[in-house]
């Protein structure tokens, strides 16, 4: 049947878009942009038709949700950081059939998930930023999964991730990539001093925990990482409470994962938060 061909944990910092524009920050995120373009290149080489994004900017207060409209088009300004991302045009095709499969398979696994194909829902910037650089030619269809889950258990998100892989491999006729779109630690710099933290972590503790996590990945200590994920998410202000990461590792096998990581964009600080682009073998 289908194939899960690529899995990654990625940054989506809005300063990537700012990095394109003339001004004092032009070029500040060239490395992150290059990492996204490299992941996009790999997706093309692998024959991927659809990218599923676990988006930590899609906030939900009940259930899990899949945005699988047939078409996404508009002009986006971030309500969180309108001085960073403003008037960003986008247009991508969706994949309603795959989105429905993901939702039904997750629900059958015990995690109530709704697919929205006939919808006015738009995409959030956890999806729009990576698609800008990975999907410039609009080759890939896009499906977004809500991953800023306010009252949800990480174990349910891991179950959803497992269901996503099962749906792809057992029910779908095609080749898919999954992206966990969110930071590592995610404590924004305090208002009034944020300009000083464009390339700095908010606190050395957060940086040291992030670096230890990357080391665990590089050493293949997956059982240790998955065991610490709930506390890591809590103590280090995990973006979206790290539900995107739980979904990713659920799809990879959780503590039984035996693969390896390829760091595409090395760990970097952005506005107090910890960021990376990393591809995991599947």
PLM features: residue spans?
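Flexible, D/E/H-enriched segments
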Residues: 1-49, 61-159, 170, 191-282
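Short loop/turn segments at strand-loop or loop-helix junctions that form parts
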Residues: 9-13, 55-57, 182
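Beta-strand elements within well-structured catalytic alpha/beta cores of enzymes
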Residues: 49-55, 174-184, 248
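Non-transmembrane, aqueous-exposed alpha-helical and coiled segments at domain scale
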Residues: 162-176
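Short, conserved secondary-structure transition motifs
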Residues: 184-190
């Amino acid at each position: 049947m289908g194939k899960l061909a690529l899995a990654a944990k990625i940054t989506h910092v809005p300063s990537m878009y700012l990095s394109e524009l003339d001004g004092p920050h032009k070029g500040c995120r060239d490395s992150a942009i290059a990492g996204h373009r490299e992941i996009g290149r790999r997706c093309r080489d692998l024959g991927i038709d659809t990218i599923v994004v676990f988006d930590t900017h899609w906030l939900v207060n009940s259930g899990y949700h899949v945005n699988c409209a047939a078409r996404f088009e508009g002009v986006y300004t971030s309500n969180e950081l309108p001085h960073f991302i403003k008037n960003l045009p986008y247009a991508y095709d969706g994949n309603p059939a795959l989105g429905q499969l993901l939702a039904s398979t997750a629900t059958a696994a015990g995690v109530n998930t709704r697919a929205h194909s006939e919808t006015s829902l738009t995409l959030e910037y956890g999806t729009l930023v990576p698609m800008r650089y990975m999907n410039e030619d609009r080759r890939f269809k896009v499906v977004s999964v809500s991953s800023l889950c306010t009252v949800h258990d990480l174990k349910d998100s891991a179950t959803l991730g497992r269901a996503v892989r099962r749906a792809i491999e057992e029910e779908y006729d095609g080749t898919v990539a999954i992206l966990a779109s969110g930071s590592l630690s995610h404590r924004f710099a305090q208002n009034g001093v944020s300009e000083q933290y464009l390339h700095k972590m908010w606190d050395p503790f957060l940086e040291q925990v992030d670096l230890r996590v990357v080391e665990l990945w590089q050493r293949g200590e997956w059982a240790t990482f998955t065991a610490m994920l709930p506390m890591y998410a809590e103590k280090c202000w995990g973006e979206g409470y790290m539900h995107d990461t739980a979904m990713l590792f659920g799809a990879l096998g959780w503590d039984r994962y035996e693969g390896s990581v390829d760091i595409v964009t090395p760990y970097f600080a952005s506005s107090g938060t910890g960021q990376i682009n990393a591809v995991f073998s599947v």
